From Swiss-Prot:
UniProt cross-references to Gene3D superfamilies, sorted A to Z: 2.80.10.50
Domain of life: Eukaryota
Naturally occurring in which organism (per UniProt): Rattus norvegicus (Rat)
Protein name: Fibroblast growth factor 7
GO cellular component, one term: GABA-ergic synapse
Length: 194
């Protein structure tokens, strides 16, 4: 039997990274034992889209969510039977129940369930309601880190900036030209219907 003799010692700063590298390579080779090199590369690839994107299936098209949209200004978005868009503080108001339909990836249309009107924004940034859905009814939905959503017109911009759906402190719609993504008037929390 041969006795092992340590002939060279790695400097301490290099010892740990080398040890971890050996362990990592050994683990990968064990885990990928029966895979081809191509399969191994795709399973270990850290830049694959699945690793870095969140899974929001409803943003991919065709999905319908029924929600109340609660603004950070303490108003629920409402579309009444005459097509008037404004806020209400009554949680149980039937006109504040919305269908949020995914039109394309990140693009939604918002429809009042009771009124059957679609939320729309014109070129001037004014919110209004339409019976028929068209390009004015498409909004880019963005989920913020604070768990609120913003909805910007997918068709219209003002001086290169996005125009957002927003309700002021009195529950009245704010013109899209005067809105920014950071403003709490443009932040809505989609609340599940209970």
């Amino acid at each position: 039997m041969r006795k092992w003799i340590l002939t060279r010692i790695l400097p301490t700063p290099l010892y740990r990274p080398c040890f971890h590298l050996v362990c990592l390579v050994g683990t990968i080779s064990l885990a990928c034992n029966d895979m081809s090199p191509e399969q191994t590369a795709t399973s270990v690839n850290c830049s694959s889209p699945e690793r870095h994107t969140r899974s929001y299936d409803y943003m991919e098209g065709g999905d319908i969510r029924v929600r109340r949209l609660f603004c950070r200004t303490q108003w629920y978005l409402r579309i009444d039977k005459r097509g008037k868009v404004k806020g209400t503080q009554e949680m149980r108001n039937s006109y504040n129940i919305m269908e949020i339909m995914t039109v394309a990836v990140g693009i939604v249309a918002i429809k009042g369930v009771e009124s059957e009107y679609y939320l729309a924004m014109n070129k001037q940034g004014e919110l209004y309601a339409k019976k028929e859905c068209n390009e004015d009814c498409n909004f880019k939905e963005l989920i913020l880190e604070n768990h609120y959503n913003t909805s910007a017109s997918a068709k219209w911009t003002h001086s290169g900036g996005e125009m957002f759906v927003a309700l002021n402190q009195k529950g009245l719609p704010v013109k899209g030209k005067k809105t920014k993504k950071e403003q709490k008037t443009a932040h809505f929390l989609p609340m599940a219907i209970t």
